[in-house]
């Protein structure tokens, strides 16, 4: 699963997920899966969607993952009193703003790409849409 190799600080503030995204254009592949809503994707969700797409395209074509979970989420164990410091890191997330391209694909037909992205979108907690590369 995806997570940073090393970080300057182990734990992070909660923060807010406002604003618009960077990385809104399809830049590596021909087709892309773009976020319409905002939220956060866990490393498990990113990997689950990637596996669904890879299985559907049957090892032809190429897939790029354009998001990386770089924010640690902590939680305290069950039935522990409040206080005594922040909990341990449980999992990693990537904060998503509307317009962010999550995955890209190349080397397959548009029909197969649409089906693969539909399978991936079912694994994700945010609303997404299918986009193609615009050639100027």
Swiss-Prot record:
Domain of life according to the entry: Bacteria
Job description of the protein: Binds 23S rRNA and is also seen to make contacts with the A and possibly P site tRNAs.
A GO molecular function held by the record: structural constituent of ribosome
Classification via InterPro entries: Ribosomal_uL16, Ribosomal_uL16_bact-type, Ribosomal_uL16_CS, Ribosomal_uL16_dom, Ribosomal_uL16_sf
Subunit structure: Part of the 50S ribosomal subunit.
Protein name: Large ribosomal subunit protein uL16
Signal peptide: none
Gene Ontology biological-process annotations: translation
Similarity field: Belongs to the universal ribosomal protein uL16 family.
Keywords on record: Ribonucleoprotein, Ribosomal protein, RNA-binding, rRNA-binding, tRNA-binding
GO annotation, cellular component aspect: cytosolic large ribosomal subunit
């Amino acid at each position: 699963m995806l997570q940073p190799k090393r970080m300057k600080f182990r734990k992070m503030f909660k923060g807010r997920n406002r604003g618009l995204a960077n990385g809104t254009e399809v830049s590596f592949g021909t087709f892309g899966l773009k976020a319409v809503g905002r939220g956060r994707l866990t490393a498990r969700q990113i990997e689950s969607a990637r596996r669904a797409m890879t299985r559907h395209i049957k090892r032809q074509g190429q897939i790029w993952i354009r998001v990386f979970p770089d924010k640690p989420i902590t939680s305290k164990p069950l039935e522990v009193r409040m206080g005594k410091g922040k909990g341990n890191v449980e999992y990693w997330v990537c904060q998503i703003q509307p317009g962010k391209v999550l995955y890209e694909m190349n080397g397959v037909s548009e029909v197969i790409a649409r089906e693969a992205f539909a399978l991936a979108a079912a694994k994700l907690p945010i609303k997404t849409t299918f986009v193609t590369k615009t050639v100027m």
